[in-house]
Amino acid sequence: MRYCLNIEELFQDIDFYDRFKAAKEAGYDNVEFWGWNGRDIERIKHECEINQINITGFKGDLDWSLCDLASRDDFIEWTRKSVATAKYLGCDSIIVHSNSIFEDGSSDYSDQY
């Protein structure tokens, strides 16, 4: 079993990239975080290397849905990019949801097709 910290929720008082070191100093070898978009992937890799931290998972989807024909291609392309990013970071899993959630909390596209 691997224990990991979600550095998105912990150490919020310090810069995101400094949280890898903080996790190591707290005694952990594994971290997870939410999305990788908008983040400096090279810096994440560097922080993992210098702090000997592994990434066990991150969110690999955005607001598109595999169930929505209008955004399916975007969803698939982003998932491919997420897999490539995970491989680059040495991460062996990503979290991908098949549906985006509407503002009312639903995710049913059946009325559109």
Task: Give, region by region, the residue ranges found by the protein language model.
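Acidic (Asp/Glu)-rich catalytic clusters
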Residues: 18-25, 39-59, 80-90
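A short alpha-helix capping/helix-coil boundary motif
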Residues: 1, 22-25, 60-63, 99-103
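Acidic-and-aromatic substrate-binding clefts and catalytic sites of carbohydrate-active enzymes
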Residues: 10-14, 30-43, 64-73, 102-105
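Active-site acidic/histidine proton-transfer and metal-coordination neighborhood
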Residues: 69-113
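Hydrophobic faces of well-ordered beta-strands that scaffold small-molecule active sites
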Residues: 2-7, 31-33, 53-60, 94-96
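Short, composition-biased local secondary-structure segments
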Residues: 6-21
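Conserved, mostly hydrophobic/aromatic
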Residues: 5, 23, 31, 48, ...
